[in-house]
Each structure stands twice: as C-alpha cells, then as structure tokens.
From Swiss-Prot:
It holds the Pfam family WXG100. It is found in: Secreted. SUPFAM superfamilies: EsxAB dimer-like. The keyword Ligase does not apply. This is ESAT-6-like protein EsxF. Keywords: Secreted. GO terms for cellular component: extracellular region. The gene is esxF.
Length: 103
C-alpha cells in the first residue's frame, strides 16, 4: 500500500508471479516423483526395523512435501484469479470513465 493507504496493483506482475509459482509447483511435483521412485527402490531392498522406521518417516515427509506442492499450486491459481479480476475491473473502470468523459 502507498503512503495514503491506497492499494496499487499491477495485474501483469501478478500474472508473472502466478506463472512463476505454478512453474515452481510443477517442478516440485516432478522432483518429488523422481525422489519417490529412488526412495522406493532403496526401501524395496531394506529389511528390518530401521527400514520400517525410515519408510514411516519418508511417508510423513513425502505427504508434507506434497502439501507444499499443492499449496504452491493453489496460491498460483488464487493470484492469477485475483490479477485477472483486477485487470477486468481496471478495464471496466477505464471504459466507464471514457464514456462519462465523452470519449
């Protein structure tokens, strides 16, 4: 917000940020899938209590990482939606002002 408490928004910046977040979420999903495959192979040959304990810890960590990825995706969508809304309102306001001003 500015010094006068006016909210200033640049929809193009919001769209760019949303695209970056979405890209990060997609990259994280790919990396998690690769890591999951590697850990799955490792756990496949690991027997005993330590293997079970690691497997349980891995599942917990993997679930948390998946929630982070989902959160990034949701945040990207929300920011993109808000940016589009601001752009729509800005365009509509400009049109109304042109009509009121006669041109």
């Amino acid at each position: 917000m500015g010094a006068d408490d006016t909210l200033r928004v640049e929809p193009a910046v919001m769209q760019g940020f949303a695209a970056s977040l979405d890209g990060a979420a997609e990259h994280l999903a790919v990396q998690l899938a690769e890591l999951d495959a590697q850990v799955g192979q490792m756990l496949g040959g690991w027997r005993g209590a330590s293997g079970s304990a690691y497997g349980s810890a891995w599942e917990l960590w993997h679930r948390g990482a998946g929630e982070v990825q989902l959160g990034l995706s949701m945040l990207a969508a929300a920011i993109a939606h808000a940016g589009a809304g601001y752009q729509h309102n800005e365009t509509a306001s400009a049109q109304v002002l042109r009509e009121v001003g006669g041109g």
